[in-house]
Amino acid sequence: MATCAEILRSEFPEIDGQVFDYVTGVLHSGSADFESVDDLVEAVGELLQEVSGDSKDDAGIRAVCQRMYNTLRLAEPQSQGNSQVLLDAPIQLSKITENYDCGTKLPGLLKREQSSTVNAKKLEKAEARLKAKQEKRSEKDTLKTSNPLVLEEASASQAGSRKESRLESSGKNKSYDVRIENFDVSFGDRVLLAGADVNLAWGRRYGLVGRNGLGKTTLLKMLATRSLRVPAHISLLHVEQEVAGDDTPALQSVLESDSVREDLLRRERELTAQIAAGRAEGSEAAELAEIYAKLEEIEADKAPARASVILAGLGFTPKMQQQPTREFSGGWRMRLALARALFARPDLLLLDEPTNMLDVRAILWLENYLQTWPSTILVVSHDRNFLNAIATDIIHLHSQRLDGYRGDFETFIKSKQERLLNQQREYEAQQQYRQHIQVFIDRFRYNANRASQVQSKLKMLEKLPELKPVDKESEVVMKFPDGFEKFSPPILQLDEVDFYYDPKHVIFSRLSVSADLESRICVVGENGAGKSTMLKLLLGDLAPVRGIRHAHRNLKIGYFSQHHVEQLDLNVSAVELLARKFPGRPEEEYRHQLGRYGISGELAMRPLASLSGGQKSRVAFAQMTMPCPNFYILDEPTNHLDMETIEALGRALNNFRGGVILVSHDERFIRLVCRELWVCEGGGVTRVEGGFDQYRALLQEQFRREGFL
């Protein structure tokens, strides 16, 4: 630093002592942060300009800074020990401070010797200038080595590089790949991801999978809000919230999602109006011609047809496409949000359980549509068949990290098993090798003739990489209690039932269905066809307009609603919920019941609002099965459940000794459980003899006829 000090003294002989100390301090403490002369000019150039008065212009100040920068670079090896370095991973201070006594006093910090003779006013003025400069700089440089960003209760921190920052700010970064390295994501005091990396290559379709509650939805939100840094030139859309209802027709709402087209059309109308009114100044005609060329380039005239095809594929009839958005229910507005995202075609499309809002027909259409998607997709889904149809890669979230796999979900399962097997083999082989070396060390530790060999073996042990045993995910087990006596049919039936809310719109006409304790019936059909209405008729929650509902006197039905979350008190814990619903039992019984569905330990005592969607579903299952029903009616039970839980639910239903009727859109779950397939359509229910294969073939043929494929 003496050389830099000499440069300052020689170039600015009149420099104030306090300012001199201040500048040399900045140069010393920030030397590792100056990656170019521009950084140094930005840090102290303005201050040196004030010191020089009129004796040096900008070029002169820059020349001085260049000399000091060269000196700092030459001195770099000597100052390396004090330089700032990029951490291997972001550090959580809360984890470090847990090891310290909060009551510890640090006298060196509390009472510091005041030996400085610097003029307080001058120092204050200099520090104010530096603070203003640093604030200005921090606005430009958003890439710091650990930058906490908060989204509701979630936060993220990540390492960054100045090189990427400069490419981004200069506009030279033209890549549409998304690469985020070495980041953490936390939710409250829980670490969801630690030192994780995610790489999304342009044009590939990624399925994000993992157990409930590990942070998949939180990760999507971090990307959507750019709390995890996605390059600014990459457009992204996160289908999370339903479209707000107003008087805009559904089709127009979708068209408006293309902001480029809308801006061009708006400007076209303005220019046309000016020319028609005689207010044109001469340049309007040329601008209008340019706008027409751009509209033709983006095929603006074909946009309404493309939007209509998307809406039709998602189940909107021509009449519905012209309805105001305020007339749609929440589920249909979510479909509308998905349609807008598909129409807008962002560079990165983020989807969180898109199949939850769709029926089987719409899911099959979406599978076909996404297979030709031109840009990048990251989708959270627990629908195995959906991921097999659309995913080119799988990202597995587990153990606070992300592992990437090439291929669809079935390929991922095989690759993961092979990877775990290889990891276990490597771990066991190293353990044997370590043990072999340790035996030698223990045997000859006190043998002077073997001392050098023992030391060599100890160094070998130190150099071995630390391999950890394979972290296997626990198996999910669910069981429906069935300690009841069987009884003879008829168990549950609807006979010649008519039902409607409005006589002008009959939902069912002469409906006749029946089920017994051996039944495993799955109901499918388009949204609005009456699936949930039929379930409520079977439950007895709705009374037929005509016809009869018959239920056995010993029948005890357990009902799972697709809107179960809305029926839970989210301010209480799972244990409190069961205690209120079934009072008078010991807490151990409530905990045991919840444990059957994977809600154990502190999870059972946390407010339901803090649980993931899948965990709330498990609580709803625990509540539903507490009275030991002998028949279950389930409306979309797999929504929000992870794949392992869906598999466990399927096994539990197959082992259950009572009857089951369920509505589902999950193809694998239907194939796992279903013995009968009912299709709701045209005011009635049809039994499909060929099962789901026949139903899928019928839908594919319908798509071909309607031109969707």
UniProtKB/Swiss-Prot annotation:
Displays an antiviral effect against flaviviruses such as west Nile virus (WNV) in the presence of OAS1B. Residues 178-424, 492-707 form the ABC transporter domain. The lineage of its organism: Eukaryota, Metazoa, Chordata, Craniata, Vertebrata. One of its GO terms (molecular function) is ATP hydrolysis activity. The gene is ABCF3. This is ATP-binding cassette sub-family F member 3. CDD domains: ABCF_EF-3. Belongs to the ABC transporter superfamily. ABCF family. EF3 subfamily. It comes from Homo sapiens (Human). ATP 2 binds at residues 525-532.
